Amino acid sequence: MRPFPAVLSDLGAIGFALAGFTFWVLTDTSIKLLGQSGLPAYEMVAFLGMFMAIFLALYGLARGQVQVLLPKRLSLQLGRGCLDMANNVCVVIALRHLTLTLFYILVFMAPLVIALLSAVFLHEGLPWRKGAAIVAGFAGVVVAVHPWGSAREGDWIGYAACGVCVACFSVNMVWSRVLTRTEYPESLAFFSGIVTAAAGFALMAGHAAPLTPLLLGEMFVMGLFCALGTLCFYIAVKHTSAANVSQYHYTQLITGTLVSYLIWRNKPGLFVLLGGVLILASGLYVAASAREVATLTEGN
C-alpha cells in the first residue's frame, strides 16, 4: 500500500508545493533566529537533520509504513543527501549575513540554473527568448546586490553561501525528479535527514557549543518545519513537472518579506526591489515556457 495516491492531480501537487515552500520559509526564519545565538552552523544542521529524521520515522510508524523510508538506490540517495547537507550548511551561513528578503531574491536564481542545466545535460534546448530571460534574471541579481553601492543589505560571505545553495538545490531538484520514479518521497526526505545529522554530529566531535533547553526547543520546531516542507516538496515533484513546482518557489519572497518585516522590521531597499522584479519576471517566464513544453509533450 502506497502512502499517497499513485496519481495526484496537478492542483493537488501544486498545493503540496505551496505548503512545502511555506514550511521552508518558517524553517529559514527559525534558522535565522537560532543563528543569533552563535551556534556553529554544523551543530544547527546536525540537530536539524536529526529532528527531521525522527519526525519522518514517527510518521512512518504511525501509518504502519516504515518500509517506505528505506532507500532502494543507496549510492544515489547518499549523493543527493550530501547535496542537501551542503545546502543546509550554506543556508545557515547565508542567513547570518543577509536579510530574509535578499536571501530569497538570490536563491530565486535556482529555476534559472535548472533551465541551464536541463539545456546542457538533458538536451532540452534553449530558445533565444528563454536565454534572454535567464540573462535578465542574472542581471536582476546584480541589481539586487548592487556592488557599486556602499549601503548593501548583505556581504560577500552571504552572497557566496547563496551561490552554493543555488547550485546544490538546482542539481538536487533535477536529480530528485529522476529518483522519485523509483523512490518514495518519504525515503528521500528521511535519508536526507540521516545524512545531514551524521555529517553534522561528526563535525561536532571536534567542537560542540553548549545547549540550553530553549535552544533545543527552537531546533525541535526548526526540524519539524523542515520535515514538513521537505516531504511536501518531494510529493509535489513526484506528481507534477519540475516547471510547475519551481514557479511557486517565488511565493517565498512574499512570505519571507512579510516575516522579515514582522520580526526584524526589515524593509527592502530600492535596488533589492528592482532586482527582485527582474528575477521574478524572468523566472516566471522560464517556468511558464517549460510548462507549455511539458503540456505539448504530453499532448503528443
Regions found by a protein language model. Give the residues of each.
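Helix-helix packing/entry segments at the starts of transmembrane helices
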Residues: 103-109, 179-195, 230-262
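Membrane-interface helix-cap regions at the ends of transmembrane helices
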Residues: 2-7, 52-72, 139-152, 195-215, ...
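Loop-to-transmembrane-helix transition segments
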Residues: 12-20, 60, 65-90, 156-165, ...
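Transmembrane alpha-helices of multi-pass small-molecule transport proteins
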Residues: 12-13, 37-86, 167-172, 190-206
